[in-house]
Amino acid sequence: MIKLIVGLGNPGAEYEATRHNAGFWLVDQLARMGGTTLRVEGRFHGLAGRARLWDQDIWLLKPSTFMNRSGLAVVSLARFYKILPDEIVVAHDEMDLPPGAAKLKRGGGAGGHNGLKDIAAHLTTQEFWRLRLGVGHPRNLPGGAGAGREDVVNFVLKPPRKEEQQAIDEAIDRSIDPLGLLARGDAERAMAQLHTVAR
């Protein structure tokens, strides 16, 4: 069962269209589907709303704390509503997957993602679900061999190219039904459905 879906990103118009905000894009789509408007919730350090999705009430959250402090928002809402770590899905950009790929997994390391790292620290566990939305890696760009840390930061804080954006949008669309299966407690089918079409 899933009770909270968190999208990771950075607040502010200047970050809205950047690769790092792929998690926000997914949550925005779910809010539209659930006919809800996310509102500023100071006690939860973000934009939050309850949506009716897959015949269940599910909280949606977009932290407004900037990426590396996302855990504060997640733990605040989860504690208030007594939501357990394994009832949480965190949607985030994933550089180890190409644009158009999406994968679900529970637990595991942060893979260098500061948002995931902070959430694990605040929840004191890594046993929450992650929806990894592929955005690609700068080393795969022309002349991108041996991309350093600065290249990575610049890459995630820039908008994807048009064809990449289209692929990411398609991956988000394709993630909706598997998320519904996961929300209803069928994790195996959720992963099988999403991963059989993952590129």
Curated annotation (Swiss-Prot):
Transmembrane segments: none
Cellular component, GO, one term: cytoplasm
Binding positions for tRNA per the UniProt entry: 15, 66, 68, 114
GO MF terms, alphabetically ordered: peptidyl-tRNA hydrolase activity; tRNA binding
GO terms under biological process: protein quality control for misfolded or incompletely synthesized proteins; rescue of stalled ribosome
Residue(s) at site: Discriminates between blocked and unblocked aminoacyl-tRNA: 10
Enzyme Commission number(s) of this protein: 3.1.1.29
Subcellular location: Cytoplasm
Enzyme active site: 20 (proton acceptor)
Subunit structure of this chain's protein: Monomer.
Family designation: Belongs to the PTH family.
Name under which the protein is recorded: Peptidyl-tRNA hydrolase
The organism's taxonomic lineage, starting at the top: Bacteria, Pseudomonadati, Pseudomonadota, Betaproteobacteria, Burkholderiales
Gene: pth
